Amino acid sequence: MPLLNSVTTPYAEALLQVVNENLQTEEMVSEVKQLLELLNDSPELEKALSSPILETEAKKKIIIEIFSNKVNSSLLNFLKLLADRQRIGILTSILNRFLEIYRENSNIALATVTSAVELTDEQKGLITQKIVNIAGTQKLELVTKIDPSLIGGFVASVGSKVIDASLASQIRKLGLSLSK
């Protein structure tokens, strides 16, 4: 998505610059993650904000109504700016790009761990230690997902690196070796 990045990056960098100046970076990162979760959980809201039928003022009214008590003033003003500039339709992409740039600047690796069952805190800690060694970074943001089809074990991915320690993968490999 290089073309989309060329549109989202300036907005994401501008938001990061504002929060860095106001020393609100950690707070903003938390709010952006919550906002992304909200948008993910309510596709109707995202469709309404993306709709070309709704006027800019109507979109701003929706933004104020829904977010004025949930986000800080910097983020609220940013959302209204995106509505004014007809960019609110790519809000999710802009917020994801903001988080990417934040992680790059803070040297934080993003790891996704998919397991067959919910991981305990101890398991998350052990996996985090292993991934930190592989990724070569001191900080790691861990996103966990559940996929019962793995049967057991986990699959971890950091950037282009994938560690497949799932039982399903081992069974598949065993089946391939037996079929030869």
From Swiss-Prot:
Q: Which GO terms describe its molecular function?
A: proton-transporting ATP synthase activity, rotational mechanism
Gene name tied to this protein: atpH
| Annotated keywords | ATP synthesis, CF(1), Hydrogen ion transport, Ion transport, Membrane, Thylakoid, Transport
Q: Where in the cell is it found?
A: Cellular thylakoid membrane
Q: What is its main location?
A: membrane
Q: Matching NCBIfam families, A to Z?
A: ATP_synt_delta
Protein name stated in the entry: ATP synthase subunit delta
Q: Tell me what organism the protein belongs to.
A: Prochlorococcus marinus (strain MIT 9312)
Q: Which domain of life is it from?
A: Bacteria
Q: Extract one GO cellular component term from the record.
A: proton-transporting ATP synthase complex
